[in-house]
Design a protein with these regions (language model features):
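Terminal accessory/targeting
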Residues: 1-118, 130-137, 227-257
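Short, glycine-rich nucleotide/cofactor-binding loops
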Residues: 121-125
Length: 257
């Protein structure tokens, strides 16, 4: 019995020792000028999250925020003992409302005031004009999702357009395996020109989101309706260079979805 009590006492002493040491180290660190500096400046570097905008069954995705990870930043800088802005380490602040908890909504716009997305559906009419253009998003029909095409289009973000906009589980399973293996992105967006709850459910069940462009057409439609966050489906690529120059001239950057 005495032996058991002694062992219990030793274990308790060791645990207390670790606990006490940890408390002492935390206290010492909190008084370190570097830690004081990090706590004083953390608000200056904070970027608040932006909540998603939801209107019935449509959504404009939100944005994650950022805050300084005090402990990791301190560990990164403590060897030198001085504050270095370039060594700050951040962690995400998630919005309370985002696409991650509203996947059953149609995405109808991006969340940036100075960025737009340009989508092209790959076919015999468009393929000659898009191969070497970066930052556009390309949708391929099921029959066009081949090793050759995907390797040729590796500069772009690639997704499946199903069978000319008709999605089934079998098509998504097949196409996503190929895209995820060969392209530089994961296949996570379906494309619809209008709302369709059947395709929305099929895509959601395959862990994909559904995008409906805010602008569909050519130069005139873009010129008349272009705003920050626009998702543009370009149906005629014969003057894509002119369209890209126009978008850039209005101060917008073209980004993938």
């Amino acid at each position: 019995m005495k032996k058991i009590i002694r062992i219990f006492f030793i274990i308790s002493l060791v645990c207390f020792s670790f606990f006490y040491t940890d408390k002492v180290m935390n206290l010492l660190n909190s008084k370190d000028p570097l830690m004081v500096k990090l706590n004083n400046i953390k608000k200056d570097y904070e970027v608040l999250p932006v909540n998603a905008i939801i209107d019935n069954d449509t959504i404009v995705p939100g944005k994650k925020g950022l805050e300084v990870d005090i402990d990791k930043s301190y560990e990164e800088m403590k060897l030198g003992g001085i504050f270095r802005e370039e060594s700050l380490i951040y962690k995400d602040i998630l919005p309370s409302s985002s696409i991650s908890n509203n996947k059953d909504k149609y995405i109808v716009k991006g969340n940036s005031n100075n960025e737009v997305s340009l989508i092209v559906i790959y076919n015999s009419l468009t393929k000659q004009n898009i191969t070497n253009i970066s930052n556009i998003t390309i949708y391929l029909n099921h029959k066009d999702i081949t090793n050759t095409n995907i390797k040729k289009l590796k500069k772009q973000e690639l997704y499946t357009y199903g069978n000319n906009g008709v999605y089934t589980k079998e098509i998504l399973d097949n196409d996503n395996i190929i895209i995820n293996k060969l392209s530089n992105n994961k296949s996570k967006y379906c494309l619809l020109k209008e709302k369709n709850s059947t395709y929305l459910n099929i895509c959601n069940n395959n862990n994909m989101l559904v995008v409906i462009p805010s602008i569909i057409g050519g130069y005139n439609n873009i010129k008349n309706n272009l705003t920050g966050g626009s998702i543009i489906l370009l149906e005629d690529t014969s003057n894509i260079d002119i369209i890209i120059k126009y978008i850039n001239s209005k101060g917008y950057t073209i980004v993938p979805l």
